Amino acid sequence: MGEGIQRLGAMEEIFGRDRLTEGLRGKVREMIMALAEAELAEVLAAGSYERSEGRLGYRNGKRQRSISTGLGATVIELPRARISAGERDKEWQSGLIARYQRRARSVDQALLGCYLSGANARRIRGALSPLLRGAPLSKSAISRLVGRLEALFTQWRSRSLASEAVVFLYLDAIALRVRIANKVISVPVLVGLGVKEDGQKVILDLELFQSESSSCWEGFFEGLISRGLKRPCVVIIDGNKGLRAAVEKNWPGTAVQRCTVHKLRNLERYAPRHALEEVKTDYHRIVYADSLEQAKKAYRDFISKWNKLAPKVVVSLEEAGEELLTFYRFPKSQWKSLRTTNAIERLNGEFRRRVKTQSSLPDARAAERLLFGLIISGQIQMRRIDGWREIKHVSPLKAA
């Protein structure tokens, strides 16, 4: 507490005394107490010192309570009362302020925001000292907030997906460093991101697995399908073989779009250094063509040109084949959104930016909870895809 007070004093030396906030804080104190008095009067069916035949209880003094609001900590006096409940009376409990509440919801939201940004308890106390104004903030208080987040995550993970009309489905993995069995290792969090008929993106599920093997991706699929997710029009994926096998096993014949950016990275690994730019230019003629017909011609030209000059490059291209061109079968306004898994890559970037202050996460559940918290707290925003107004014209495709 002393540290917080010292920091607050230092801030006042820098910025001067905040008389406006002090005045508003006093008004907030008066307003909270007035609201509590009005709430109690309604419950008792009688105001303070008012005689009434319909009285449902009686007042029993007041008690002091310190509460932190968006304007800082303030001490209020809450009325106490006994309420008639049959043969026995019971103590009145305000619906405005819960029994053990010490902070307004806005302060708890700020606490959670700091936690999700990677701050520990000491840093949180420092960052929020103007709000807390010396009020205690223990590790257990933060743990209770995290516990509420955990409960919400568990509920979210079991929600039905039957009503989610997903047209496009992006599947990819995010690598995080997590401590497992006393060793810090890099593990994938499998992510399913859907695009609904109104163009809005929605995270369908995220789950940490030990690898991106076929069995792990199949387990991820089983979770989605068991919760009611229906087959989408197209699935956008990278080149992971386990993921591709899981798509075919669970939704055989579903159209697949291979990420064109991931494939370019693969081609670059096999391209001769002196020919790298030329390979990229020829590849771009395939994935940035004006039509499917032009793309197919560019594809054939690429193979014809590089088959002898860089055969491994051609083998890599043919591994994906026409699944690189699936997006051309959709409205042109949607091509940019459909040809890559960038929708999840952007999430990956946001996640990494927020966890870079932590060398590793303490366990698997903490990693999942952190990603979930960043999404539901609004710290990560997802916009509609390009060309969403034309989604109504999209119909299921057969595999290329």
Residue ranges and their predicted role:
Residues 1-11, 15, 19, 42, ...:
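Acidic/histidine-rich catalytic cores and adjacent linkers
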Residues 1-120, 125-151, 155-165:
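Short, flexible loop/hinge motifs at secondary-structure junctions
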Residues 34, 38, 109, 122-126, ...:
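Solvent-exposed alpha-helical segments within well-ordered globular domains of core cellular machineries
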Residues 36, 40, 71, 83, ...:
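Mobile genetic element proteins and their domesticated derivatives, centered on retroelements
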Residues 38, 42-46, 114-117, 130-131, ...:
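Conserved, well-folded catalytic cores of nucleic-acid-processing
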Residues 234-241, 246-282:
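Conserved beta-strand -> loop -> alpha-helix junction used to position metal-binding or nucleic-acid-contacting
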